[in-house]
Amino acid sequence: MKKLMIAGVAGLCAAVTFGLESANVVGYQTKTIPAGFSLSTPTFQDIGAEGLDLQNFKLADTAAGDSTEMIQFLDADGQCTEMWVWLNANAGMEPGWYDFNTWAPIVKTVVPAVGYLMNSVSPVDMVVSGQVKSGETTIALPAGFSVRGNNTPADIDLQSIKLADTAAGDSTDMIQFLDADGQCTEMWVWLNANAGMEPGWYDFNTWAPIDYTVKAGEAFLFNTVSPVEMIIPSAL
């Protein structure tokens, strides 16, 4: 099986604060990003929007800000398609995300539940803010690999993340969680009536039902042979 090699895992939620603005639940969340690579996804979206502006992924003042903190987005083959670096006064720039090659400022919206690779030479805090998405998130998964995650600011049970009825459900839809060396530590497969099972996530090797908590903002590697939709529950 093809593996995506990374060197770290996503930092867990350090703090989350909520408020109420009109009908929107708004707030912010602080995550500690470890040294090395990690998989993550934003837990808020911009108020009145359907995603979060990448410039609202704020790194703390302790960030090196000299192009050694970067975000990468991947295609269905696990290859990097976009790479942005965090620059600040240490690079003579206003704090923000810039193009890796040109250092030009960038505009990018990250839609709910889309994950990314974060790379940092040292641990650093990241703050995301905005509104909590109301209602569940339904997101398309292409054939091949994709990075998806828990886009709510709360921990959720993996079994609450569902695949659409069109899923093959015969062990060809799978989720992997990775360790600090980029090796798979947990692998779960989606089974349904096509495998003679109740729809849900099961151990890859034994097909035993599993109990696993996906942390707020934690992302994972998903692999499928055919496009399918994933449904992530609402935090509200």
Predicted feature residues:
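Sec-dependent, cleavable N-terminal signal peptides
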Residues: 1-21
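Residue-level detector of intrinsically disordered/flexible regions characterized by low predicted structural confidence
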Residues: 4-5, 60, 90, 164, ...
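A short, polar beta-strand/turn micro-motif
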Residues: 17-67, 75-79, 106-172, 212-236
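Short acidic-hydrophobic catalytic motif
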Residues: 70, 101, 174
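Intrinsically disordered, low-complexity segments enriched in Gly and acidic/Ser/Thr residues
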Residues: 151-202
